[in-house]
Amino acid sequence: MPRLGLILNDGKELALKAALSIESKLEKSGYEVVRVSSSGGMVGFANPDQHMRTLGYNACVPEGFDPSMKLAIVLGGDGTVLSAARQTAPVGVPILTINTGHLGFLSEAYLPDIDKALEQVLASQWEIEERTSLVVSVMRGEQRRWEALCLNEMALHREPLTSMCHFEISIGRHAPVDISADGVILSTPTGSTAYSLSAGGPVITPDCPVLQLTPIAPHSLASRALVFSDLEPVTVFPATPERLMMVVDGTAGCYVWPEDRVLIRKSNHPVRFIRLTDHEFFQVLRKKLGWGLPHVAKPEKY
């Protein structure tokens, strides 16, 4: 019997109700359904000495999810999709994202369209779009103390009531970069429309093989976002006496101490999104973020 996954934000009553209905329909169509919570993709703890789960990003993969699974349906908002990406990318399971949240920038369909979407899925009328993911590791000497997959961004920033941060950042074999700011963001093209955008970074189309370094509130007129090849590994050395907070995709994170360093590299496990229709990126930007809309209404023609 073919298997399908069902990942949901079980803290939302709407998502849970929809999941039960979808599960029933799929089982009647002859599929085995493995239903799990998106909370399994969250990786966080108070400090690197208090792990919530086994170290290593493969630990987020739910039981029953493996490369033989046809696909997984994700029910929730963008945060749920980010967690689900961490649960599915290591085993290459493609995800169909159904929005039950607010913005739904990463969603392919909405709940009112679920019946039509299921028909296309069961008829295999879909394509795969692969998005770059990153591996984020916290190192102390040669010891790996924390690790997670990242679809959007890694943000490393100061805690409240602490001073401005200083960072030395090494990108591949290039000369190190010194940045003084409240923090730094290292993002994928997918993440260029998230936190990095709010910090003044440019929008990057998803098919570009690049990464982006964006300072958060830099204390310099010369410190701006930098775009570079995604083949370049990045190392961030905190040069500040206070501990820092690291947040990955808003659903994972830990503290980073002065003696630690953060390694970021492109993952061998892209996130595989199912596309049911033509997913034209500029149209998504226009619809979700208002890109390219006129600032004033154009007069009607009579």
Swiss-Prot record:
Main location class: cytoplasm
- Cite the GO molecular-function annotations of the record: ATP binding; metal ion binding; NAD binding; NAD+ kinase activity
Q: Which UniProt keywords apply?
A: ATP-binding, Cytoplasm, Kinase, NAD, NADP, Nucleotide-binding, Transferase
Q: What is its EC number?
A: 2.7.1.23
Q: Name one GO biological process term.
A: NAD metabolic process
Q: What is catalyzed by this enzyme?
A: NAD(+) + ATP = ADP + NADP(+) + H(+)
- Binding sites annotated in the UniProt record for NAD(+): D78, G79, N152, E153, D182, T193, A194, Y195, S196, L197, S198, A217
Which parts of the chain span the membrane according to its record?
A: none
Q: Does the keyword Nuclease apply?
A: no
Top EC class of this enzyme: transferase
Which residues does UniProt mark as catalytic? D78
Give a yes or no for keyword NADP in this entry: yes
Spell out the InterPro entries in the cross-references: ATP-NAD_kinase_N (IPR017438), ATP-NAD_kinase_PpnK-typ_C (IPR017437), NAD/diacylglycerol_kinase_sf (IPR016064), NADK (IPR002504)
Protein localization: Cytoplasm
Q: Write out the function statement from the record.
A: Involved in the regulation of the intracellular balance of NAD and NADP, and is a key enzyme in the biosynthesis of NADP. Catalyzes specifically the phosphorylation on 2'-hydroxyl of the adenosine moiety of NAD to yield NADP.
Concerning its family, UniProt says: Belongs to the NAD kinase family.
State the HAMAP family in the record.
NAD_kinase (MF_00361)
Q: List the protein's name.
A: NAD kinase 2
What is the source species? Prochlorococcus marinus (strain SARG / CCMP1375 / SS120)
